[in-house]
């Protein structure tokens, strides 16, 4: 009887598409002392694999991070229970690959076809190839660049502390390479988009439309085609009461008087504090989501430019990403955690579905894994990027800064992170580096 109590009946199953990883679904007894490693040994034995494959395990949709005994105890179950245990291939550690050096803090990143675009505190947008060579530089912003996004293989958009967005042409015979750049700063600006009254800190693109989030509490809605937007007179738009500083800023941006200036299609107003991020809904281009320092998540109808839902939390929200297949929004906060929300839930329903805990400072950027709908990565002012599987409340891996000059709490803040297929997990911050960590083919064979 003592031996029976030290075992529990387990029924293994998997959703892996590779049928060579499927075991018979007959239940068997397993020692309650087993953790992931011991359970992985059982699966490998049942499969008879020549090369062992590490596995992770889930019970009731949650990753197992303790022994079976601890799980039974936490759930108030006896060892007579039958546990349905799902197994899935374990994830490779996001090992360090390389870094690119930038002139100043790296504040924004995006990944396109075989290229990376970065925004920096020196006001310059740069495109890089995957070998680390700067292909082009785009000068024009008069303050830090806070957001960048590829529109297509030939165009991109940026937003910055100078309160403007800029549409750029990335391929143009008139655009010279870095070593020939002098004197061509404005040659490849398609249009300057004006209308915000404070820094522009986030942009998103879907089709021919752009969204921008600003510290003026508003969201800008723009077109990727300058012909769709109303022209702005560069000086008249300032008004007679404009400060001398504002007029000076405007003169600095008027080196090329022929640069088009355009007004937004609309400004979306409802937030009561700076808007930190705005994104298009993945399944509906007429819907957008935003998060703000006013503690709220808002849903917008872009056809009517109206806020149609507001969900209030207890903390400033600083970043957001959608998990499309799960229909959830992950939000990074000033309270150092990541919260998961269902934007479809009724306002009277539970606001927060789940919390991911582990960061020690603001969570300022998020992105999803291109290979797994349950996984995401987060960047924080605590100097780390964390990798998460939302089926566990704690992170799977923590990525630290690799540059030797980094001092904890001095110059280690991470401002931007992207997770892209064929590239990996890339991050940028105060260390003036774009750091690459393995994030492609993440499952062990």
Curated annotation (Swiss-Prot):
CDD domains: WD40
WD repeat ranges, renumbered to this chain: 101-138, 140-178, 195-232, 270-310, 312-351, 358-398, 409-445
GO biological process: chromosome organization; maturation of 5.8S rRNA from tricistronic rRNA transcript (SSU-rRNA, 5.8S rRNA, LSU-rRNA); maturation of LSU-rRNA from tricistronic rRNA transcript (SSU-rRNA, 5.8S rRNA, LSU-rRNA); protein-RNA complex remodeling; ribosomal large subunit biogenesis
SUPFAM superfamilies with a match to the protein in the record: WD40 repeat-like (SSF50978)
Keywords: Nucleus, Repeat, Ribosome biogenesis, rRNA processing, WD repeat
Residues spanning the signal sequence: none
Span list, region Sufficient for interaction with ERB1 and association with 66S pre-ribosomes: 99-445
Ubiquitin-like (UBL) domain, as annotated region: 8-89
Chief place where the protein resides: nucleus
Gene Ontology cellular component annotations, sorted alphabetically: nucleoplasm; PeBoW complex; preribosome, large subunit precursor
One GO molecular-function entry: ribonucleoprotein complex binding
Pfam name, any one: WD40
Subcellular location: Nucleus, Nucleolus; Nucleus, Nucleoplasm
Alphabetized PROSITE patterns for the sequence: WD_REPEATS_1, WD_REPEATS_2, WD_REPEATS_REGION
Disulphide connectivity of cysteines: none
Function comment: Component of the NOP7 complex, which is required for maturation of the 25S and 5.8S ribosomal RNAs and formation of the 60S ribosome.
Subunit relationships: Component of the NOP7 complex, composed of ERB1, NOP7 and YTM1. The complex is held together by ERB1, which interacts with NOP7 via its N-terminal domain and with YTM1 via a high-affinity interaction between the seven-bladed beta-propeller domains of the 2 proteins. The NOP7 complex associates with the 66S pre-ribosome. Interacts (via UBL domain) with MDN1 (via VWFA/MIDAS domain).
HAMAP family listed in its UniProt record: WDR12
Family to which this protein belongs: Belongs to the WD repeat WDR12/YTM1 family.
The protein's name in its UniProt record: Ribosome biogenesis protein YTM1
Organism ancestry: Eukaryota, Fungi, Dikarya, Ascomycota, Saccharomycotina
